[in-house]
């Protein structure tokens, strides 16, 4: 006698099992290795189960489990809440066999791997031979082993739709729906509302105006900010005057944090746009490779930007934070981390400008432009940095977005003396230190608008504005077309690269360095400066800088 697995999931005794050799049967009896063990090693594996048998079991004991899929997925029996009812257990990581009886049958006779026909059809589909070959089956089980699945804390979500009969020729997007969902975040407008006594999140797509909003109820898993933090925030005063930019940086987010948790946490302070940073779009092949590695299309950066509708919401968010070492922190939870402190970095409007304490005048001809400034850098921090290298600074202005008043990563600095201005232009670079940021940025002359030629003062160009500015430390002047040719086109062709003088023009908010002159069709090669006057240009700039009060200039009157 031998124990066999009955269709109902029970064990029964039967006649001696006959081993098969092709289509011929032998009368040799096969001894069972189970000896009463409920987990018997039999010659019947999952590869031999027909789809009709699984379908009948689904109809009897798993009704409704596959209603959303249209067809029955055999793995749903393996991922059921109580798989012992079916005589099959969880998948074993260390073997190709996928039932628990082989895993625990230490004293039983485990059938060798070669006894199983790797190309034997197990499902009634056209591509069954290719779908269930052992190599692909092993690859699939290895993928399960590398996922978040474990025997002690079993989660059936990663197992669903993973080993279905037709799943071996689909993309990884369909094999790993949970990975894709957690890795790709979309920008959403979130507002928390109270409907029928319950709190809901109204989620809308800012790019789909006609799309109806989506509502998500705030249950136990999505509590957002604790009530104590909200109560403490309400007790603190709110200024009637704007104090912060409506755009806030959030750093240190857990990698596995969900969109819903971020919505619930920061939506508690008011209507907000969640702006997730993204990678550039990749092609399909690159995206498939990233999904194979377990990553999604969103860069794993750990930060997000918040754009609140009202500035008051930012003040409430700051009041709810803990202040530690000049930084604001707020607690946020994820599936793997509870109450993690994430950094909240608001931008104060008072940090946009810096003015020197003395009453020295601000000369715009001594202004430089600095790009690539770290966003947390305040105007006073940049002023101290430049004063330590080149000389006293009278004004610093951080370039901001006109609507949100958030830094754009650039600044304008005006020096108190012409000597400090020339030293900064000659130095070209400065190391900006702010907190943990340390960045080397370039210093360029700030090209202004509506400036007359410094050589002819408009007499030779009919008083038109000068289109060119020379940023070389020996020039630092505005030139009309005629004066540029007269002062820069020399006869010496052996000039070094650092001695070359290129024209700079201002177009809108951008300053460009031209490699050829627009008014000369054949182009030009920069040459050393050729001045007919005995006084050097630098000397004239230094003398002029102490008394000139000219206004900014930038965009030339010509279109190039």
Curated annotation (Swiss-Prot):
Keywords: Developmental protein, Differentiation, Repeat, RNA-binding, Spermatogenesis
GO biological process, one term: spermatogenesis
S-S bonds: none
UniProt-listed PROSITE patterns: RRM (PS50102)
Disordered as annotated region, ranges: 1-43
Subunit record text: Interacts with fbf-1.
Name used for this protein in its record: Cytoplasmic polyadenylation element-binding protein 1
């Amino acid at each position: 006698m031998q124990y066999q697995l009955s269709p109902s999931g029970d064990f029964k005794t039967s006649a001696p099992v006959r081993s098969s050799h092709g289509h011929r049967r032998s009368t040799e009896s096969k001894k069972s290795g189970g000896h009463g063990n409920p987990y018997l090693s039999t010659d019947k594996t999952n590869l031999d189960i027909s789809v009709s048998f699984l379908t009948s079991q689904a109809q009897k004991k798993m009704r409704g489990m596959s209603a959303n899929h249209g067809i029955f997925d055999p793995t749903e029996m393996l991922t059921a809440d109580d798989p012992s009812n079916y005589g099959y257990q969880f998948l074993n990581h260390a073997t190709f066999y996928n039932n628990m009886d082989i895993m625990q049958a230490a004293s039983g006779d485990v059938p060798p791997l070669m006894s199983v026909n790797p190309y034997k059809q197990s499902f009634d589909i056209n591509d069954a031979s290719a779908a269930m070959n052992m190599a692909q089956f092993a690859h699939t089980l290895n993928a399960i082993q590398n996922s978040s699945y474990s025997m002690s804390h079993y989660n059936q979500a990663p197992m669903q739709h993973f080993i279905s009969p037709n799943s071996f020729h689909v993309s990884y997007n369909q094999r790993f729906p949970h990975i894709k969902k957690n890795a790709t975040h979309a920008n959403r407008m979130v507002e928390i509302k109270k409907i029928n006594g319950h709190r809901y999140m109204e989620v809308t797509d800012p790019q789909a105006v006609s799309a109806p909003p989506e509502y998500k109820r705030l249950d136990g898993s999505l509590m957002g900010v604790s009530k104590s933090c909200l109560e403490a925030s309400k007790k603190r005063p709110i200024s009637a005057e704007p104090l912060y930019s409506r755009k806030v940086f959030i750093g240190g987010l857990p990698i596995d944090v969900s969109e819903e948790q971020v919505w619930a946490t920061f939506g508690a302070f008011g209507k907000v746009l969640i702006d997730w940073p993204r990678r550039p779009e990749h092609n399909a092949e690159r995206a498939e490779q990233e999904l194979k590695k377990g990553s999604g299309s969103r860069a794993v950066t750990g930060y997000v930007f918040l754009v609140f509708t009202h500035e008051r919401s930012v003040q409430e968010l700051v009041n709810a934070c803990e202040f530690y070492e000049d930084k604001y922190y707020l607690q946020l939870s994820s599936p793997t981390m509870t109450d993690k402190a994430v950094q909240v970095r608001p931008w104060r409007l008072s940090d946009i400008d810096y003015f020197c304490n003395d009453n020295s005048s601000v000369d715009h001809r001594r202004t430089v432009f600095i790009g690539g400034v770290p966003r947390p850098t305040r105007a006073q921090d940049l002023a101290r940095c430049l004063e330590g290298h080149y000389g006293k600074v009278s004004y610093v202005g951080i370039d901001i977005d006109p609507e949100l008043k958030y830094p754009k990563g650039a600044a304008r600095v005006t020096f108190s003396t012409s000597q400090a201005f020339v030293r900064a232009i000659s130095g070209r670079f400065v190391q900006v230190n702010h907190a943990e940021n340390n960045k080397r940025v370039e210093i360029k002359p700030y090209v202004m608008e509506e400036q007359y030629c410094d050589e002819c003062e408009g007499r030779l160009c009919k008083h038109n504005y000068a289109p060119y500015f020379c940023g070389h430390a020996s020039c630092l002047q505005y030139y009309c077309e005629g004066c540029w040719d007269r002062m820069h086109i020399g006869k010496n062709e052996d000039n070094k690269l650092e001695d070359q003088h290129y024209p700079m023009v201002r177009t809108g908010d951008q300053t460009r360095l031209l490699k050829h002159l627009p008014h000369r069709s054949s182009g030009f090669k920069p040459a050393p400066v050729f001045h007919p006057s005995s006084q050097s240009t630098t000397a004239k700039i230094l003398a002029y800088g102490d008394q000139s009060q000219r206004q900014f200039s930038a965009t030339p009157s010509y279109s190039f």
